[in-house]
Swiss-Prot record:
Originating species: Vesicomyosocius okutanii subsp. Calyptogena okutanii (strain HA)
PANTHER family: CHORISMATE SYNTHASE
Cofactor(s) the protein needs: FMNH2
Recorded name of the encoding gene: aroC
One GO CC term on file: cytosol
GO biological process: amino acid biosynthetic process; aromatic amino acid family biosynthetic process; chorismate biosynthetic process
Classification via CDD domains: Chorismate_synthase (cd07304)
Name of the protein in question: Chorismate synthase
Length: 365
């Protein structure tokens, strides 16, 4: 099975399954000398872990990360950083009824047809359980980017089902289980989710992620454009079905006179492009939005087939998120950090001493 590594100079490789013994991560390409302990990685893991509210999966995992290599006396050595997170609350018996059947909307059928074998327990490798290790690896990138470049990455829930969150108060983002910026919307979200859970159904969500203090020049045209790699990393997240950069699909209704971002010596007048021109960062905020589908793990019956092609009816048991988007914010932040960290390393390798007579334009007026 290939495809478990992302990045060129700053890379992460993950291994492990939903009901396996542990999740493993290898981070390669981190510069030496970065102060790093498990404490630096745990906060984001705690934000992602299940069982923290009635609105998420009731699987209780502590998600305690341990650094196995790549540090000495509390600092990175420049060698590969190995991480491990133990799985402690597997309940594999919940999945015995789907051993020889395929859950519609899941990777059961495609994994089986591709590999001829699949770990049916909790989805195996295709489970979002794997993203816990991405969050741990992304924590290394987030710390380096903030320390060396003051780059800050922050995300929030902008829509859950029909409920849109439009007011922005960043002090609220970690005060509720939804990563919602509007305190007045929290009770509305809770009521909606309570009704949804009782119905046995699920719902999709939209997450917005913003990168502040971006330098100019990150991105490797043509095929490794920054926005192309961002889309790649975002689409690798379970359940993501859409990615927007800047105004995204709204550009369809815009005229060129509306969309172009005027440049002045005091700053850009707008940021419709989302901080990227020609695949290269402009120094403005990077604006990313992702759409996550509703989970297919439902207690409501649906038609499917078994391994031999016989017709069956599937009812999914187990512990599942009625809205996977609720816990997706730390995952999206981590993947964006990993992508930007890789491009920082690549830009530094090729263009470290490049000088220009053109002044750096402030991000915005």
């Amino acid at each position: 099975m290939s495809g478990n590594t992302i990045g060129k100079l700053f890379t992460i490789t993950t291994a492990g399954e939903s009901h396996g013994e542990a999740l493993i991560g290898i981070v390669d390409g981190c510069p030496p000398g970065l102060a790093l302990t498990e404490v630096d990685l745990q906060d984001d893991l705690d934000l992602r872990k299940p069982g923290t509210s009635r609105h998420t999966s009731q699987r209780h995992e502590e998600d305690l990360v341990k650094i196995l290599s790549g540090t000495f006396e509390g600092k990175t050595t420049g060698t590969p950083i190995a991480l491990i997170i133990q799985n402690t609350d597997q309940r594999s018996k919940d999945y015995g009824n789907i051993k020889d059947t395929f859950r519609p909307g899941h990777a059961d059928y495609t994994y089986h047809q591709k590999y001829g074998i699949r770990d049916y327990r909790g989805g195996g490798r295709s489970s979002a359980r794997e993203t816990a290790m991405r969050v741990a690896c992304g924590g290394i990138a987030k710390k380096y980017l903030k320390q060396e470049y003051n780059i800050k990455i922050k995300g929030y829930l902008s829509q859950l089902g029909p409920i849109k969150i439009e007011n922005s108060d960043w002090l609220e983002v970690h005060n509720n289980p939804f990563f919602c910026l509007d305190a007045n919307k929290v009770k509305i979200l809770e009521k909606y989710m309570d009704t949804l859970r009782k119905s046995g159904d699920s719902v999709g969500a939209r997450i917005n992620i913003i990168v502040n203090n971006m330098p100019v020049g990150l991105g490797e045209p043509i095929f490794d454009r920054l926005d192309a790699d961002i889309a790649h990393s975002m689409m690798s997240i379970n359940a993501v079905k859409g990615v927007e950069i800047g105004d995204g699909f709204r550009v369809v209704n815009q005229k060129g006179t509306e969309h172009r971002d005027a440049i002045t010596l005091t700053g850009f007048k707008s940021n419709h492009a989302g901080g990227i021109f020609g695949g290269i960062s402009s120094g403005q905020d990077i604006l990313v939005s992702i759409a996550l589908k509703p989970t297919s793990s439902l207690s409501l019956p649906i038609e499917s087939i078994d391994k031999r092609g016989g017709p069956i009816e599937v009812i999914t048991k187990g512990r599942h998120d009625p809205c996977v988007g609720i816990r997706a914010t730390p995952i999206a932040e981590a993947m964006l950090a990993i992508t930007i960290m890789d491009h920082v390393m690549r830009h530094r390798a090729q263009n470290l001493n490049i000088e220009s007579i053109t002044p750096i334009i402030p991000a915005s007026i």
